Amino acid sequence: MSTIRCDIVSAEKEIFHGEATLVVATGELGELGIAPKHAPLITRLKPGKVVVTTANGEQLDFAISGGILEVQPQVVTILVDTAVRAQDIDEAAVRKVKEEAERLLANRGNTVDVAEAQRQLAEATVQLQALERLRRNLKH
C-alpha cells in the first residue's frame, strides 16, 4: 500500500513522525483528506482534530489548536501551536479549563479577554471530542 510521510510539529517538539495512508484535518474551507500522491497544497487549519491512518491501519487522533498544513509530493507537514494525542488528554483538567472559559464568557466584564476565553473554550472542546472519539474506537 502506498504511503506518505506525515510530520506534526509544534514550536516545542515533534509530535508525530511516520508513514501514513491518509491524513484528515479541518482546513478553513472544510475537511481535507490527504492521501499519497495528493497535489501540492498549503492551507490554514482550524482548531480541531487531525486523524492519521498509519501504514499498519492504526488511526491516531490528535487535538490541535489550529495551524498550517503543507502537502509536498512525499510529505505532509502540519505546523501547530499545540497538539495533543487523544490518549494523552487529562479529561478532568480539560473540563476545568472549559468550565472556566464558559464562566468568563457568560459573566464577561471589562477585564475579560474574550478572544483568549473563546480560544480556550474551542481548544478544550476539541480535546474532549478527540477523547470521546478515542473511547468510541476502543469500544469497537
UniProtKB/Swiss-Prot annotation:
Domain of life: Bacteria
Localization in the cell: Cell inner membrane
Keywords: ATP synthesis, Cell inner membrane, Cell membrane, CF(1), Hydrogen ion transport, Ion transport, Membrane, Transport
InterPro entries: ATP_F1_dsu/esu_C_sf, ATP_synth_F1_dsu/esu, ATP_synth_F1_dsu/esu_N, ATP_synth_F1_esu_C, ATPsynth_dsu/esu_N
The UniProt record lists the keyword Hydrolase: no
Assigned GO CC terms: plasma membrane; proton-transporting ATP synthase complex
Protein's membrane topology: Peripheral membrane protein
GO MF annotations in UniProt: ATP binding; proton-transporting ATP synthase activity, rotational mechanism
NCBIfam families listed in its UniProt record: ATP_synt_epsi (TIGR01216), PRK00571.1-4 (NF001847)
Description of how the protein assembles with itself and partners: F-type ATPases have 2 components, CF(1) - the catalytic core - and CF(0) - the membrane proton channel. CF(1) has five subunits: alpha(3), beta(3), gamma(1), delta(1), epsilon(1). CF(0) has three main subunits: a, b and c.
Function, in words: Produces ATP from ADP in the presence of a proton gradient across the membrane.
Family assignment from sequence similarity: Belongs to the ATPase epsilon chain family.
Protein name (record): ATP synthase epsilon chain
Lineage: Bacteria, Pseudomonadati, Pseudomonadota, Gammaproteobacteria, Lysobacterales
